[in-house]
Design a protein with these regions (language model features):
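Sec/Tat signal peptide C-region and signal peptidase I cleavage site
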Residues: 24-27
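Histidine-/acidic-rich catalytic cores in large beta-rich domains
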Residues: 29-347
Length: 347
């Protein structure tokens, strides 16, 4: 259906923000801040690495020649897997999406493609994006399929059977800038209703599509990084402008969180958000776009957990040698109920 009048009205304030130069299609969604700034207090709420077991990965840790994802259990790094910062063709690789499945394998997107890796670090399935295209979305659909969104001209959604290697469903996705491959999508998710919910970062909207590629619902949001359809029917959206908002099906904001709700900690780009079974929200905060000097990164908080009342109950800052997690993009809590490949977790 066509965008509602609410969508058109919301677009007006987005246009105003654009006129002030608020949008940038690349990683650097915020200007550099003076450093070193007091980014977070010495003592943070929660139990640090021991708060939850979790899978963690981040984009563009350009301090090192390898990019690493981590599994943390009992407050310690239990497993890692690394890829090169640059592939054999010299293209930058980064972890944009990652999910630990119930069988122990991990599906991940790496910008230059996507793959499935076993706990023994054996690649069980791999997809390489064609030159000029990028893959930042890899969602497991059961244990035998992966939904990919491929940035480029054209951008498209693909449902791939990893057992056969065949693409079973695909359709093109509209974008704001066909030539701006890198700034098009970071996150999209299949819903339990069988539709695709896509955060159009360069189109300033979240849109839902049926499997024929028809838009069935849309919402104007400034530079959305991720969008998740919650079990209550609402949609949880993060923006790399530093806010998280929960919208009703009618487009009303029913809950929101931003920097002003936690003034004691400097927050940067909001990327992934998880709505937990207890109602709390976990948010990853990616810092390299604002903190240009990596020496300043260890002062920053990577992940926060807040209650529905916006109380901060966990702030993760882990840059020490034995658990140098790097910038935060993906976090999957491993103590949440259900099977992630069945859509049981809200992330």
């Amino acid at each position: 259906m066509k965008p509602s009048s609410r969508l058109r009205k919301s677009a007006l304030w987005i246009a105003a923000a654009l006129s002030l130069g608020a949008i940038n299609s690349g990683h650097a969604a915020e200007g550099p801040i003076a450093a070193p700034v007091e980014l977070s207090p010495a003592v943070l709420p929660g139990k640090g690495l021991a708060q939850h077991p979790f899978l963690y990965a981040g984009e563009w840790d350009h301090r090192y020649p390898d990019q690493t994802m981590f599994v943390v259990r009992d407050g310690k790094v239990a497993w890692t897997y690394s890829i090169k910062l640059k592939d054999d063709a010299g293209q930058i690789q980064e972890f944009s999406d990652a999910t630990l499945l119930s069988n122990g394998n991990i599906v991940f997107a790496r910008k230059t493609g996507a793959a499935l890796v076993s706990p023994e670090k054996k690649i069980l399935w791999n997809y390489d994006a064609p030159p000029g295209f990028e893959v930042h979305v890899a969602q497991p659909i059961g244990l035998n399929r992966v939904m990919l969104v491929q940035n480029g001209n054209p951008a498209k959604m693909m449902m791939v059977n990893i057992a056969t290697g065949k693409t079973e469903t695909e359709f093109k996705l509209p974008v704001g800038n066909p030539a701006g491959t890198h700034g098009q999508f970071r996150r999209a998710r299949m819903t339990l209703a069988g539709t695709l919910l896509a955060a159009h970062m360069d189109n300033n909207k979240v849109a839902e599509y049926d499997m024929s590629g028809n838009e069935v619902w849309a919402l104007a949001v400034l530079s959305p990084w991720a969008a998740v359809r919650l079990k209550n029917g609402n949609t949880l959206v993060t923006s790399n402008r530093g806010f998280v908002k929960e919208f009703s099906p009618k487009g009303d904001v029913v809950w929101e969180f931003s920097q002003q709700d936690v003034p004691s900690i400097k927050l940067f780009n909001f990327q992934e958000a998880n709505r937990l079974a207890n109602g709390n929200t976990v948010i990853s905060c990616w810092c390299p776009g604002a903190l240009k000097d990596p020496k300043d990164w260890p002062n920053s908080v990577q992940v926060i957990e807040v209650t529905p009342q916006k109380k901060l109950v966990w702030a993760l800052r882990s840059w020490d040698a034995d658990a140098n997690l790097g910038p935060a993009t993906c976090i999957q809590l491993l103590d949440e109920p259900g099977k992630p490949e069945d859509g049981d977790q809200q992330r």
